[in-house]
């Protein structure tokens, strides 16, 4: 083997100590980075790749959720529009029904008023007829009494009885 003399090594050439610290640090840093990149680089790349895939998947899921939320919002808006339309229809039907009910109530009230007026007229007529009949009976009774009195004064008893009977029969027939 060939040995390098020690004097050559310590003379600044060869395997001696390098007294320039900056160059040494740069070389050491390059070696460390090279070792780190060669050994740890694959793991870091794999970690970054996995993180990238996770982020991409999260973004896709977020987009899907956003689309679903948009669809649900559209459905909710459609349902709201339908509900408002139905509410308007129900309100209109209620107004129509209320108007019909109002007309029906007015008609029934008018019919009831007409019926009450008719009953009132009938009652008045009945009471008038009853009063007329009572007055007629009283007039007839008074007339009969006066006739009896006149006949008693101017006629005999049998004649008086026969005239009274005939007059009473005539009066009864006329009623």
Swiss-Prot record:
InterPro entries: ATP_synth_b/b'su_bac/chlpt (IPR002146)
Gene Ontology CC, one term: chloroplast thylakoid membrane
Parts of the chain that traverse the membrane: 26-44
Single annotated GO MF: proton-transporting ATP synthase activity, rotational mechanism
Gene name of the encoded protein: atpF
Localization terms from the record: Plastid, Chloroplast thylakoid membrane
Keyword Ion transport: yes
Keyword Transmembrane helix assigned: yes
Family stated for the protein in its record: Belongs to the ATPase B chain family.
Further remarks about this protein from its record: In plastids the F-type ATPase is also known as CF(1)CF(0).
Stated role: F(1)F(0) ATP synthase produces ATP from ADP in the presence of a proton or sodium gradient. F-type ATPases consist of two structural domains, F(1) containing the extramembraneous catalytic core and F(0) containing the membrane proton channel, linked together by a central stalk and a peripheral stalk. During catalysis, ATP synthesis in the catalytic domain of F(1) is coupled via a rotary mechanism of the central stalk subunits to proton translocation. Component of the F(0) channel, it forms part of the peripheral stalk, linking F(1) to F(0).
Signal peptide as annotated in the record: none
Keywords in alphabetical order: ATP synthesis, CF(0), Chloroplast, Hydrogen ion transport, Ion transport, Membrane, Plastid, Thylakoid, Transmembrane, Transmembrane helix, Transport
Lineage: Eukaryota, Viridiplantae, Chlorophyta, Ulvophyceae, OUU clade
Quaternary structure and interacting proteins, as annotated: F-type ATPases have 2 components, F(1) - the catalytic core - and F(0) - the membrane proton channel. F(1) has five subunits: alpha(3), beta(3), gamma(1), delta(1), epsilon(1). F(0) has four main subunits: a(1), b(1), b'(1) and c(10-14). The alpha and beta chains form an alternating ring which encloses part of the gamma chain. F(1) is attached to F(0) by a central stalk formed by the gamma and epsilon chains, while a peripheral stalk is formed by the delta, b and b' chains.
Protein name: ATP synthase subunit b, chloroplastic
Topology versus the membrane: Single-pass membrane protein
Database matches in Pfam families: ATP-synt_B
Organism name: Tupiella akineta
């Amino acid at each position: 083997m060939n040995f390098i003399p020690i004097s050559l090594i310590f003379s600044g050439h060869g395997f001696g100590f390098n007294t320039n610290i900056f160059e040494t640090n740069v070389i050491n840093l390059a070696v460390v980075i090279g070792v780190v990149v060669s050994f740890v680089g694959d793991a870091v790349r794999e970690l970054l790749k996995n993180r990238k895939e996770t982020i991409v998947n999260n973004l896709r899921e977020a987009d899907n959720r956003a689309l679903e939320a948009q669809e649900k919002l559209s459905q909710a808006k459609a349902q709201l529009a339908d509900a408002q339309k139905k509410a308007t229809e129900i309100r209109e039907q209620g107004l129509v029904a209320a108007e019909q009910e109002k007309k029906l109530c007015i008609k029934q009230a008018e019919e009831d008023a007409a019926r009450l007026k008719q009953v009132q007229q009938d009652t008045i007529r009945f009471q008038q007829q009853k009063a007329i009949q009572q007055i007629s009976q009283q007039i007839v009774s008074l007339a009969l009494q006066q006739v009896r009195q006149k006949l008693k004064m101017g006629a005999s008893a049998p004649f008086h009885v026969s005239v009274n009977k005939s007059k009473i029969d005539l009066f009864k027939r006329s009623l």
